[in-house]
Structure formats: C-alpha cells, structure tokens
C-alpha cells in the first residue's frame, strides 16, 4: 500500500465522519450545555 492509494481511500472514511460524527458530537455538546443551563 503506497501513499497515493491511501490518499484516494481517505475521503471514503472522512466524508461519513464529517457528515455524521461531527454533527452528532455538536448536538450532544449543545444538548448537555442546554441541560446544565436549565438546571442552574
């Protein structure tokens, strides 16, 4: 496996991560922030 193969394979991993993982983490942090604000 050389660098060019890894570079062409990388977007297939990154696109779902950016598309699903990042919004999920953002929503989770926002939810925790709202919940902690409401309790205090």
UniProtKB/Swiss-Prot annotation:
User: Does Transmembrane helix appear among the keywords?
Assistant: yes
SUPFAM superfamilies annotated for this entry?
Answer: Subunit VIII of photosystem I reaction centre, PsaI
One GO BP annotation of this record: photosynthesis
Q: Where is the protein situated, by its record's location annotation?
A: Cellular thylakoid membrane
Q: Which domain of life is it from?
A: Bacteria
Where it mainly occurs, coarsely classed, is membrane
Record keyword NAD present: no
Q: Which Pfam families match?
A: PSI_8 (PF00796)
Indicate the family of this protein.
Belongs to the PsaI family.
Provide the function of this protein. May help in the organization of the PsaL subunit.
Cross-referenced NCBIfam families, in alphabetical order? PRK11877.1, PS_I_psaI
Q: What is this protein called?
A: Photosystem I reaction center subunit VIII
Name its species. Synechocystis sp. (strain ATCC 27184 / PCC 6803 / Kazusa)
